[in-house]
Amino acid sequence: MNSKIKIIEDLSLNAWPSHQMQIYDGWILRFSYFYTHRTNCVEQIGPSSIPLRDKIAYCEEVYAKWGTPTIFKINPLMDSSFDQKLMERGYHTAHITEVMTLDLEKYKIQKPPRPVFLSREISPDWLNGLFSLKGTVNEIHRKIVPSMYRAIPKDTIFASIYDGGRIIGTGLGILDRDYVGIYAIHVAEEYRRQHLGESICRSILNSAIDEGATEGYLQVVCLLYTSPSPRDCS
């Protein structure tokens, strides 16, 4: 189980680059002007030698310069005492990330309920649709996010559902090793509960199987550790 957790942690780090990153004593500090928690947090990737108190203080100082809260991503492979250290400094649990996996060798390919347009390359149309569905109006985010998607170092599957000329649903599949990760699932509010999300996921999985994927994973973010600062869930 631990080996699979480690694999998915590695895959998810590959899948979603940040605007900028910094390596600090076995930690990765990720910066994206707080577009999402995942792209604007501290992740542990290796052993440390600097005292923990000093490392946390350093991270807080760096993120304060960016004008964003200090967020630490916690995974099941980490020492549970780290949670306590953070709580002693005033941190609290803000979101939980549920990770679901699927054995694609046992998955029965089915035709999606709704037609889905797939592309291997990102397009301005897909990005504008994503921004519209997420309500992204921050000019810095609209400037840096396209480069973050284009920096994904793996093969990609961009999915869109249209109503006329308008994108009403998006999704993204990222192929890495024998896995496909499903990301960026968004559906316009007035079109929800009409199987659009299911159609997007099935289309991505079907395409990934054609590319040789044997495992799928989906991360639904609802929890990270954050300092007591103003914040906005993306």
Language model regions located:
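Conserved beta-strand in the GNAT
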Residues: 26-31, 99, 160, 166-174, ...
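A short, internal acetyl-CoA/4′-phosphopantetheine-binding micro-motif in the GNAT/acyltransferase core
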Residues: 43-49, 185-192
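Conserved GNAT acetyl-CoA-binding A-motif
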Residues: 66-74, 209-220
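Single conserved hydrophobic/aromatic residue that forms the stacking wall/gate
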Residues: 225-234
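Short amphipathic alpha-helix that is part of the acyltransferase structural core
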Residues: 1-10, 38, 43-44, 97, ...
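N-terminal charged segments
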Residues: 1-65, 78-79, 83, 139-140, ...
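Conserved acetyl-CoA-binding loop-helix of GNAT-fold acetyltransferases
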Residues: 54-59, 193-206
